[in-house]
From Swiss-Prot:
PANTHER family: BETA-DEFENSIN 121 (PTHR15001:SF8), BETA-DEFENSIN 123-RELATED (PTHR15001). Pfam families: Defensin_beta_2. Disulfide bonds join 23-50, 30-44, 34-51. Has antibacterial activity. Belongs to the beta-defensin family. This is Beta-defensin 121. GO terms for cellular component: extracellular region.
Amino acid sequence: MKLLLLLLTVTLLLAQVTPVTKCWGKSGRCRTTCKKSEVYYILCKTEAKCCVDPKYVPVRSKLTDTNTSLESTSAV
């Protein structure tokens, strides 16, 4: 009986823990630091980072190439 009471108490305490805030269409989680396998592009309302798995982030356009500059293309 004591074991059952202990189990019930622990379960109720774990249920009261605040849930993690979701972001990026429920694919990301608001954290202060992201895991090594995650990236962030926006901030959450609590000024935490919205950590997202890179496979859920849209691919960046190849128009912004850092190796070319406007000066070299306009000199032609």
